[in-house]
């Protein structure tokens, strides 16, 4: 009541006064759904796009499209690709260590690509210069539109990665992984409600 109607306290996941609804691709993938979630799968929208539409979207959202297409082509010659999706967790120094550890866990399996989260303020371009990177402002769904782009694995901490058409396997490390890096009370908020 205090958050939904009076806006006196902040509670995440759509319980705020100004949230009318939250569109999600698949409600079943959410462990603690909010009554304001509305399931609206993106697949029917995507299926209507032509090849030209997809290229136009890539041009609009991907700043370094030509460079990335070249890196994708080169990595296709070498072998498997691993995509690591970052999350805006912890302090910046701890976050850097987290993603260095994740890279170390998966770099033997293929060429590492990074896709920073839009709210992630860590400077991956500077700190992880040796890895190809997708722009943080680019929606993850744009990866569906790169021709010949296939990842052996997509790895993330908290981002939902169920059913990604450009990945053979999705790995969501989750709160158990994060327990090693910060107090569990910080990232297990939904479990406390």
Residue ranges and their predicted role:
Residues 1-4, 93-106, 136-142:
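Well-ordered, non-membrane alpha-helical segments in soluble/globular domains
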Residues 12, 20-22, 85-90, 115-118, ...:
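Structural motif
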Residues 1-27, 145-149, 160-163:
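Active-site and donor-binding regions of nucleotide-sugar-utilizing enzymes
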Residues 107-136:
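Catalytic donor nucleotide-activated moiety binding site of glycosyltransferases and closely related
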Residues 91-94, 120-126, 178-182:
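Short, charged/polar "capping" segments at the starts of alpha-helices
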Residues 39, 131-141, 171-173, 187-193:
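Short acidic-hydrophobic, aromatic-tinged amphipathic segments that line or gate anion-handling sites
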Residues 23, 30-101, 110-120:
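Active-site donor-nucleotide binding/catalytic segment of nucleotide-sugar enzymes
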Residues 142-186:
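A donor-sugar binding/catalytic signature common to diverse glycosyltransferases
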């Amino acid at each position: 009541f205090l958050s939904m109607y009076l806006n006196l306290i902040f509670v995440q996941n759509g319980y705020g006064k100004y949230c009318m609804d939250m569109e999600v691709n698949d409600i079943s993938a959410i462990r603690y759904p909010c009554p304001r979630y509305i399931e609206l799968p993106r697949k029917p929208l995507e299926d209507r796009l032509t090849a030209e539409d997809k290229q136009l979207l890539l041009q609009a959202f991907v700043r370094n499209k030509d460079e990335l297409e070249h890196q994708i082509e080169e990595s296709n010659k070498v072998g498997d690709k691993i995509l690591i999706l970052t999350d805006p967790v912890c302090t910046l120094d701890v976050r850097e260590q987290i993603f260095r550890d994740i890279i170390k866990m998966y770099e033997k399996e293929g060429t590492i690509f990074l896709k920073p989260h839009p709210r992630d303020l860590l400077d991956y371009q500077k700190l992880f210069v040796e890895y190809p990177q997708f722009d943080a402002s680019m929606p993850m769904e744009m990866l569906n539109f790169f021709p010949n782009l296939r990842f052996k694995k997509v790895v993330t901490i908290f981002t939902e990665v169920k059913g990604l058409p450009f990945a053979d396997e999705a790995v969501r490390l989750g709160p158990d992984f994060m327990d090693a890096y910060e107090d569990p009370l910080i990232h297990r908020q939904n479990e406390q409600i």
